[in-house]
């Protein structure tokens, strides 16, 4: 059984027991989070596609950890002018493990 959920402006295909990295959620590690924006639920040959969401479907997951990705470095410069700038960015994420899919 798998489902497609929408969170953080992105869509993720999830299955029970699977761990995924999603955009940062405002919850602590160890807490449960419920994703109720379910776009598709499939159980074998039984596939339910929402218009746009599947009514009554939800995915329950537990938060494993909060973290930041590797740093992305951007360097800009103007040739022949002593002008340059270096920027770094680390995108925050939340690692969740799917406990159950209810449809």
Swiss-Prot record:
This protein binds to 23S rRNA in the presence of protein L20. Transmembrane segments: none annotated. It comes from the Bacteria. Belongs to the bacterial ribosomal protein bL21 family. The keyword Cell division does not apply. GO terms for cellular component: cytoplasm; ribonucleoprotein complex; ribosome. GO terms for molecular function: rRNA binding; structural constituent of ribosome. This is Large ribosomal subunit protein bL21. Part of the 50S ribosomal subunit. Contacts protein L20. SUPFAM superfamilies: L21p-like (SSF141091). Keywords: Ribonucleoprotein, Ribosomal protein, RNA-binding, rRNA-binding. The keyword Ribosomal protein applies. The gene is rplU. It comes from Lactobacillus delbrueckii subsp. bulgaricus (strain ATCC 11842 / DSM 20081 / BCRC 10696 / JCM 1002 / NBRC 13953 / NCIMB 11778 / NCTC 12712 / WDCM 00102 / Lb 14). Pfam families: Ribosomal_L21p (PF00829). InterPro entries: bL21-like, bL21-like_sf, Ribosomal_bL21, Ribosomal_bL21_CS. One of its GO terms (biological process) is translation. NCBIfam families: L21.
């Amino acid at each position: 059984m798998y489902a497609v959920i929408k969170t953080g402006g992105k869509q993720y295909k999830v299955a029970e027991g699977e761990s995924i990295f999603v955009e940062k959620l405002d919850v602590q590690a160890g807490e449960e989070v419920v994703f109720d924006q379910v776009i598709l639920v499939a159980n074998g040959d039984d596939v339910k596609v929402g218009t746009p969401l599947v009514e009554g479907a939800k995915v329950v997951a537990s938060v494993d950890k909060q973290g930041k990705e590797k740093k992305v470095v951007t360097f800009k410069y103007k040739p022949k002018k002593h002008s340059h700038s270096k920027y770094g960015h680390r995108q925050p994420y939340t690692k969740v493990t799917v406990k159950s899919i209810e449809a």
